[in-house]
Amino acid sequence: MARLTVEECMGRTNNKFKLVILASQRAHDLNSGASPVVKHKNSKNTIVALTEIANEQLDVHLLFNLAVQRCRKYMEKFINSDDSYVVHKSKDNIDIFQKNATSNFDELGANSLNVENSKFLDGDNFFLTQKE
């Protein structure tokens, strides 16, 4: 694929923003040492990731679940951090994101880290394949 366009990748997902999540996760995997499944010559990992998605050579559900797990690990580190900026903030000045993230994380509990048990994808029609 000499010139890859977003439209060529849209057959795998119904939303450009979801495509960005998928490509980002795959590029992260490639940067971490994963082997590409397509042949490429001096292409950047972002282009390789989009090519793999467009050629339907990846399980997009698995890729999305990996992205969710990576995001949850990041959020868990942020919420549980001993960062002096977060610790010394007065309770009145806690920003809305941090307050909501902390309360939602406490409500979800430890079981929320298991993507298979999560109802996050139920009924969302998150991925549209050409077979559907």
Curated annotation (Swiss-Prot):
EC number in record: 2.7.7.6
One protein family per Pfam: RNA_pol_Rpb6
- Reaction equation(s) it catalyzes: RNA(n) + a ribonucleoside 5'-triphosphate = RNA(n+1) + diphosphate
* Top-level enzyme category: transferase
User: Which Gene Ontology cellular-component terms appear in the entry?
Assistant: DNA-directed RNA polymerase complex
Query: What GO MF terms are annotated?
Result: DNA binding; DNA-directed RNA polymerase activity
Matching entries from InterPro entries are given as: DNA-dir_RNA_pol_omega, Pol_omega/Rpo6/RPB6, RPB6/omega-like_sf
Coiled-coil region(s) at which residues?
none
| Gene Ontology BP annotations | DNA-templated transcription
Q: Which domain of life is it from?
A: Bacteria
Q: Which UniProt keywords apply?
A: DNA-directed RNA polymerase, Nucleotidyltransferase, Transcription, Transferase
Its biological purpose = Promotes RNA polymerase assembly. Latches the N- and C-terminal regions of the beta' subunit thereby facilitating its interaction with the beta and alpha subunits.
Which HAMAP family does its entry note? RNApol_bact_RpoZ
Q: How does it assemble?
A: The RNAP catalytic core consists of 2 alpha, 1 beta, 1 beta' and 1 omega subunit. When a sigma factor is associated with the core the holoenzyme is formed, which can initiate transcription.
Similarity section: Belongs to the RNA polymerase subunit omega family.
Q: What is this protein called?
A: DNA-directed RNA polymerase subunit omega
Gene coding for it: rpoZ
